[in-house]
Curated annotation (Swiss-Prot):
The keyword rRNA-binding applies. GO terms for biological process: translation. This is Large ribosomal subunit protein bL9. It comes from Campylobacter lari (strain RM2100 / D67 / ATCC BAA-1060). GO terms for cellular component: ribonucleoprotein complex; ribosome. Keywords: Ribonucleoprotein, Ribosomal protein, RNA-binding, rRNA-binding. GO terms for molecular function: rRNA binding; structural constituent of ribosome. Belongs to the bacterial ribosomal protein bL9 family. InterPro entries: Ribosomal_bL9, Ribosomal_bL9/RNase_H1_N, Ribosomal_bL9_bac/chp, Ribosomal_bL9_C, Ribosomal_bL9_C_sf, Ribosomal_bL9_N, Ribosomal_bL9_N_sf. Binds to the 23S rRNA.
Amino acid sequence: MKVLLIKDVKSLGKAGEVKEVKDGYGQNFLIAKGFAKAATHEVLKQYEAEQKKKAENLRFELANLEKLKEELSKITICIAKPVGANGSLFGGITKDEIAHALKEQKNIEIDKKSLECDTIKELGMHEISIKLGHAIHAKFKLEVKGE
């Protein structure tokens, strides 16, 4: 019998592959445990339609991420913090503060965990990197001013 694997099965194949297996193994184990479906014409057609939809969604998501990357590369945000007598910041600027400033100043919401920087403790311009997903990274400028 032919089955369409829904999940990866050790020693048989990866999800999405069509495999020829013995009837008992296919019916009693693979299909019963939810690892596969019988590879009928309708099931294969439905699987192909789902794959096309996933590919289209991925293309749309990648296009949006590239657009966001382009938008972020043109942005400079400014954060003002109190400074000491020697010109150094009290405390520092955290990822949370950077994400909040990006939301407040440019209306771009990002997760603070996607920021790739340490706590900033110096005045001046800094380049901040963001992981957007799907191996796409963006950079924007952060200006730290003293109050």
